[in-house]
C-alpha cells in the first residue's frame, strides 16, 4: 500500500470515528443534562401527564400543575415558502432565547421541521437545563387530499397519515432518515429531543364537509379499540378514525420508552356546541368531539385542544346584538363547561398587527386593523381570559410574521400567487400575526416622522429624485422596499393642510381618469389609476379610479353583490372611489340559514404619526407625517394597484374569466399638483400655461425599479412581545385551579 493510499485510509478512518462520535453525541447529548422525569416500573418515562382538568409536570419529585403558555412557531422566513424550510440554527437559537425570555414554557410546531430545529432545541436546552423550553409536536394530516376526497377512510389518505405519524415520532427521537421530497422536511434526524416534548398534536383544522361525508359513508365504523386509545360510546366514524391515529402515535412512541400527552387539533367550525346565530351551514354542520376518544393504557393522558379566534366564524359578531357583549369570553365558558374532567387547551388564538382587515370582531377584536400596541393588548387580555376560564393552556398564534400567507379578501389581487413570499402586502392580515415582526428592507433606514435627515443619509442607489415642475415644490424623492413605495416632498414653505391639498396621481397602465374634481380646470392626456391625497388627517389617503376599483369590479360587476353604476364602468369617469376591502359577502337563503348583507371597510386611509419604535408616539400603522415644509409618506404597494412589485406586475383592467390578471409595467409615473382650498387654483401640471390643452403625462417622471428574487428584511420584537411577557409573568405558569 502506497503512502498516499495509507494517508487516504487514515483520513477515512478518522472520518468514520468522527461520524460515529457525532452520532453518539447527538443521540446522547443530554446524558448529563437529563430533565427530571418519573420512571415507571416497566421503565417507561414520563415528564408530563394529564390529571383531571390540568396538565402536570414532574418536578422536585412530585407532579405539579402547569399552565401551558407559549407560542406557535412557523417554518419559514420572508422570501421563502414553508416547504423550503429556510430557518437556520442561528435563527432558532436567537428565537428560543427570546421566547424563553418572554416567559413562555412551550413552543408548538404544526409539522415536522428540518433536523436543525431539533438539534438547536437540544443545544439550547443544554444551556438552560434547570428550566428548559418544551415543545408540542404537531403532525400534519393530508389536508388537501382530505378536502378533495372528503373521506378520511380513503386508503391512500389513511396510509399517508399513519406513515407521517410514524415519521414524526421517529424524527423527535432522532431516528429518521428522510429523503428529499418537494415541500416536505427531510434529512438525517439524529438528535433525540424526546425529553423536551410536552405533547403530540395530531392533524389540522378539519373540513366540515369532509367530516360529515366521512361519517355518512362509514356509519358502520364508529368503534375502534386500540392498545392505547379507543373510541368511546357515541363516537362517530371520523372520531373513531382519529382514535386510530392517536393509537398509532402512542404505539410508535412507546418503543422509545416514553409517553407524552396526546391531543388532536380542532377548531370552532367543528366544535361540540350549537350556534344558531351562525348564518353559514358549513360553520355549524358537524361536530368532532374530543370526549368521544379515550386513553386505554396511556399514563401520560389525553386532552382536548382548539384553535379559537374571537372573530371567526360570524356567530361571534352576529351574536353581539348591542356591540358590547364579550362573545369570546362566553364561548370559552361554554366550551369549558362541556369538557368536564379533561384538560382543555386553546392552541391557536390572537389578532394581527396589519393595516388590512378581513373579519370584524366584537369589542374591537377584529382580524386586522390593529397597530402593534393594540395587537399586544388584545393578545395579552385573551391569554389571561383563557387562563381565567380554567383552561389548561394558551398557545398564541404566533411567533413570527409570515409573508407567504394569504387571506380571502386580498388573494384575488396578489398575482402571481407563487410570488407572495417575495413581498409584504400589509393589507393581508394573515402575514402579520407574529410577536416577532419581519419588516421590509427600509424599515430601519426610513422612519416616518417628518424629519428628512434619514432621506439625506440614504445611499443614492436607494432613492430616486423625481423632477417636479410644481411651483412651491423644491424636490420629490421616491424609494421602495418589499412593502411600500416611499415619497418625500420638500416645499419652499410650511405645509398648511387647512389651506392647501397636495395630490400625487399614479399612472401605471393605459386607461384611468384624465379629469376629475381633484383636477379643477385641468385634464390629462393619459389616465390615473390611483390618487394619493395629502391634506387634513381625514382627507389623507389613496383612492382608486372607479373603473379600476378592484372591489367594485369583482364584487359588483362580477358577483353582483354591490352596485357599480354605469358612470363607474366608463373609462375616464372622473370618479375616484375609496379604497375598500370586503369584510363579509352577501348571503341569502337557501344558501345560508339567514340573510346577511355585504359589508366592507375603507383601507385606503393613510394614518398620520410616526413608525419610529423609539418615539413615545410610536404607531406601527403610521403612513405619513409632515414637519414644516417637509412631507413624507409610505404607500402600500397594493393601494397603487401593484399585484407583485418583485416582478413589476400591476393588476390589469382586463378580467378574462371574471378574474383579475396582471400586466408587466415599466414603473409608476407620479404626477404631483397642489390645489388651493380657497381659490381652487392648481399649481403644477403646467396649469398656468396649458391654455386648455391636456397635460402630457409623459412629462411626469417615471419611478422605475428592478425586480428581485431575494428579499431584505429585518427582525424586531413588537410591542406585543413585552405585553405578553407581562401577562406570562402575571400567570407564572400556574393554572387557575391546581387539579
Kindly label every feature range from the protein language model:
Residues 32-126:
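Active-site-adjacent substrate/metal-binding segments within catalytic domains
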Residues 88-166, 245-258, 263:
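Aromatic-lined substrate-binding rim segments of carbohydrate-active enzymes
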Residues 141-147, 151-154, 164-235, 257-268:
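Active-site groove signature of glycoside hydrolases
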Residues 262, 275-362:
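Glycoside hydrolase catalytic-domain groove-lining segments
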Residues 357-364, 369, 374, 385-463, ...:
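Aromatic-rich peripheral "rim/lid" segments of glycoside hydrolase catalytic domains that contact
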Residues 450, 484-492, 629-637:
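Short, well-ordered beta-strand segments enriched in hydrophobic/aromatic residues
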Residues 465-587, 647, 651-678:
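Surface-exposed, glycine/proline- and aromatic-rich loop segments on solvent-exposed faces
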Residues 508-531, 641-739:
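Acidic/polar low-complexity flexible segments
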